[in-house]
């Protein structure tokens, strides 16, 4: 039985209420943190994966990391001199782009910059990013790492994945003697090539984590000095 228009409106209202409550929660948390910690750092965390975010939160357990979109963070910080919650904190707003994190801490700027200069995580390349290296799957039996390691250190890819390789990833594979095989080498991507969704999925399937995730530091606010300092860490 089709849903009535009324039920759809109720569902939409519930969704809007939840979104509004989340924005209000972030607003309150930001202002409370501004009253608690001396420094506020703008971390650019576009496309950050959940395990990475959890690791950063764990490493900075004595501090507070709040994630949010620019509009929400701008409202909490105050985007102008007239609306800013703390003197000159509105200067941070222009540094917030896309999905950002605000790290509230009492650790010194030297400690923060040293940590994030060194922090990096191997990551899978995403669609629309550039391929970090040339990847070609050798002809013959298809191994789980796709030729990245010697065959004696690898295992053949399980035969149940053959339909996925052939139908979803469009690789010309077939089953021969119970193993997935390629008659010819299969080029996945050239180094520097812009990846599409299919190529990114193939790289992930074969465990090619050659990309690198780094946190970009844009600026920080010092509550005692009431000043914003631009730092530009990992912005290259």
Swiss-Prot record:
GO cellular component, one term: nucleolus
UniProt keyword Cytoplasm, yes or no: yes
Stored InterPro entries: Mrt4, Ribosomal_uL10, Ribosomal_uL10-like_insert, Ribosomal_uL10-like_insert_sf, Ribosomal_uL10-like_sf, Ribosome_Assembly_uL10
Keywords: Cytoplasm, Nucleus, Ribosome biogenesis
Primary location class: nucleus
Entry's family note: Belongs to the universal ribosomal protein uL10 family.
Subunit note: Associates with the pre-60S ribosomal particle.
Listed name of the protein: Ribosome assembly factor mrt4
Source organism (scientific name): Eremothecium gossypii (strain ATCC 10895 / CBS 109.51 / FGSC 9923 / NRRL Y-1056)
Gene expressing this chain: MRT4
């Amino acid at each position: 039985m089709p849903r009535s228009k009324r039920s759809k409106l109720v569902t939409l209202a519930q969704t809007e209420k939840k979104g509004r409550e989340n924005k209000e929660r972030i607003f309150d948390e930001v202002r409370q943190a501004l009253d608690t910690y001396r420094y506020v750092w703008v971390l650019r965390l576009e496309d950050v994966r959940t395990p990475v975010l959890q690791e950063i939160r764990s490493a900075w357990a004595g501090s507070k990391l709040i994630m949010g979109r620019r509009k929400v963070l701008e409202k909490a910080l105050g985007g102008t001199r007239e609306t800013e919650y703390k003197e000159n904190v509105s200067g941070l707003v222009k540094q917030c782009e896309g999905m950002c994190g605000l790290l509230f801490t009492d650790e010194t700027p030297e400690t923060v910059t040293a940590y994030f200069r060194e922090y990096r995580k191997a990551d899978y390349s995403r669609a629309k990013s550039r391929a970090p290296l040339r990847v070609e799957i050798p002809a013959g039996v298809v191994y789980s790492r796709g030729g990245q390691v010697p065959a004696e250190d690898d295992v053949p890819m399980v035969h149940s994945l053959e339909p996925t390789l052939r139908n979803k990833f469009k690789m010309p594979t077939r089953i021969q003697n119970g193993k997935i095989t390629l008659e010819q080498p299969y080029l996945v991507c050239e180094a520097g090539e812009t990846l599409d969704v299919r190529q990114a999925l193939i790289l992930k399937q074969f465990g090619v984590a050659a990309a690198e995730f780094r946190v970009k530091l844009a600026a920080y606010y010092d509550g005692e000095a009431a000043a914003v300092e631009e730092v530009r860490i990992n912005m290259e």
